[in-house]
Amino acid sequence: MEMARISQIAAALACCALALPAAAQSSRVEKTQAEIALEQAKTTFATQKKARDDANAACAARDYEACVKAGDSYRKGMGGMQDYALALKAYDRACTGQNGKGCASLAYLNMLGRGTDKNLAEARRLYKQSCDYGEVSGCAGYGNMVYTGTGGPKNVTEGTNKLRDACERDYKWACDRLVDLGAFDPNDSAFERLKDYR
């Protein structure tokens, strides 16, 4: 009888143990895809806001690479509202600190007229300054503007050379642009005959 009672108790405990996970599952609330997406967006925004705040603080302390990051966050609207005026200020501070990326980003906004009046001559000057600081994207932008005569005199040879240099530094846009423009090798004699034709 004692053995039967132990068996009954063991069976009752086993039933209770099995019932607990089933009860816990039935009371668990699943999240919808929208709720999951909202949580992820809030987390991403908080991370981006902190990155923007950190970049602004470092920019104020004359970390010019951080100024570029702050400018990017304002231009793209990451970590807060999109604000081209603040992006321009951050990029200008970076460019003034001789950061080539800052000058190239400032040139891009001037070229498009975002946060400022469209000014192609200023964009060209800033792309050249960026290139002079060693920024490959600035060299590509400057080369493109010189090749096409945008914002200043056209010079196919100089433009081709700048684009080719940027392409050789693995800047894909410059390589694609050379193909799009049908740019010839400036050292090729056929190029000399055709350079004024374009």
Could you describe each region identified by the protein language model?
Residues A37, K69-K76, A90, S105-L112, ...:
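Hydrophobic face of amphipathic alpha-helices that form TPR/SEL1-like repeat modules
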Residues E2-A10:
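Bacterial N-terminal signal peptides that target proteins for export
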Residues V29-E30, D165, R169-R198:
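Terminal, low-structured helical/coil segments at or just beyond the last alpha-helical repeat
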Residues A61-Y64, K76-M78, T96-G100, L112-R114, ...:
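Short helix-capping/linker turns of helical repeat alpha-solenoids
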